[in-house]
């Protein structure tokens, strides 16, 4: 059939309480089967020996350190951080490729508003007849805003008073440490509201009833700098027989959530069948089509 960009399709499957619900459910099932999830800690070291990963060194928020041994290691951490966590046995050229991988960072400002001035001019029925889009790309060069999410349309269960209020997410693309990233939350929210007023999406700052800001580091793996040499890095990492790299940051690929999860599905399939090749894992969504196309 004719291919339609995901940005234009009218229906898709989405968790009732958002993507986090999926991971909360997975975590609960892991623990129910006897698995342990170590929270509030970060990986500070990756131990390797004879072509295998042997253990992870971790540090908790309270400064506690421990080593966690394992037979199989599935990594979704940024490739840059994964290689940086390995010891001095990593060749200098491989380490340089990993260190040079670029990213774009991301700030989202959530605003609860009384209403939007955007009208529903379609035949699509929505609660309270609000504009039906889940996301809107902003082309106005006079604002920094890049995209607007309308959470009411993702799932009405995300909004407490869905019949009279609208939760929107304003997305800004930036770099960690730049002037926008370093804005106080108060100034960031004020800027976001001012841009909406300037665009005519809301009428006045008093229309904003509540707000919340989130910063996301390394949200977008970028395809420049040392990315042109990433095949050398992939080949090196594939040399560790019990290490699998999955996900957007784990593969340094700008994939949608479904493709990112598919890399993990392929990994599990390989582990269960004894397949040693990583080709199917790295080849998810590499047909070079635009990443938001769907048959």
Predicted regions and their residues:
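Active-site/ligand-binding neighborhood in enzyme catalytic cores
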Residues: 1-46, 69
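Active-site catalytic microenvironments for nucleophilic, acid-base chemistry
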Residues: 29, 36, 76, 81, ...
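Conserved beta-strand segments of alpha/beta enzyme cores
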Residues: 36, 67, 207-210, 242
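A short coil-to-beta-strand element that immediately follows conserved catalytic motifs
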Residues: 38, 106, 203-215, 278-279
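C-terminal lid/capping helical subdomain adjacent to the catalytic/cofactor pocket in oxidative enzymes
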Residues: 212-217, 223-295
């Amino acid at each position: 059939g004719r291919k339609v960009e995901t940005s234009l399709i009218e229906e898709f499957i989405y968790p009732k309480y958002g993507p986090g619900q999926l991971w909360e459910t997975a975590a609960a099932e892991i623990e129910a089967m006897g698995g342990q999830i170590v929270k509030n800690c970060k990986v500070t070291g990756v131990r390797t020996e004879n072509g295998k990963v042997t253990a992870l060194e971790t540090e908790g928020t309270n400064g506690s350190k421990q080593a966690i041994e394992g037979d199989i290691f599935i990594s979704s951490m940024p490739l840059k951080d994964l290689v940086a966590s390995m010891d001095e046995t990593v060749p200098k050229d491989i380490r340089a490729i990993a260190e040079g991988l670029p990213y774009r960072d991301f700030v989202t400002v959530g605003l609860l508003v009384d209403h939007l001035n955007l009208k529903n001019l379609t035949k699509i029925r929505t609660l309270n007849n609000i504009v039906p889009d889940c996301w809107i790309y902003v082309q106005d060069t006079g604002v920094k805003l890049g995209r607007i999410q309308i959470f009411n349309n993702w799932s009405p269960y995300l909004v407490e008073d869905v019949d009279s209020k609208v939760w929107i997410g304003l997305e800004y693309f930036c770099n960690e440490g730049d002037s926008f990233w370093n804005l106080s939350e108060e100034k960031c929210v004020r800027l976001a509201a001012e841009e909406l007023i300037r665009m005519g999406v809301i009428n006045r700052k008093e229309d904003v009833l509540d707000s919340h800001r989130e910063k996301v580091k390394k949200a977008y793996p970028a395809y420049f700098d040392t990315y042109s040499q990433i095949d050398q890095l992939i080949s090196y990492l594939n040399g560790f027989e019990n290490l699998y790299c999955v996900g957007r940051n784990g593969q340094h690929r700008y994939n949608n959530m479904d493709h990112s999860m598919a890399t993990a599905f392929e990994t599990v399939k390989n582990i269960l069948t004894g397949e040693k090749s990583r080709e199917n894992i790295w080849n998810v969504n590499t047909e070079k089509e635009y990443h938001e196309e769907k048959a």
